[in-house]
Amino acid sequence: SGKGKGEKCTSACRSEPCQCGSKCQCGEGCTCAACKTCNCTSDGCKCGKECTGPDSCKCGSSCSCK
């Protein structure tokens, strides 16, 4: 049981659907992503500017707002 990609979301993660780092991104099929460039919070995804929520956040090699 590690923190790799594909890990199922915990209930705590489901309550905060847009998180980055070693945490889950429940908005992306409940998988964990090694997203280091954005700062996602339960209030939405902050990618240098605020996005409207998990669905407007796209985390990858670079972070952007859809």
From Swiss-Prot:
The modification N-acetylserine is found at S1. One of its GO terms (molecular function) is metal ion binding. Cd(2+) 1 binds at C9, C13, C26, C30. Cd(2+) 2 binds at C13, C18, C32, C35. Cd(2+) 3 binds at C20, C24, C26, C35. Transmembrane segments: none annotated. 14 cysteine residues are arranged in C-X-C groups. These are thought to be the metal-binding sites in other metallothioneins. This is Cadmium-metallothionein. It comes from Helix pomatia.
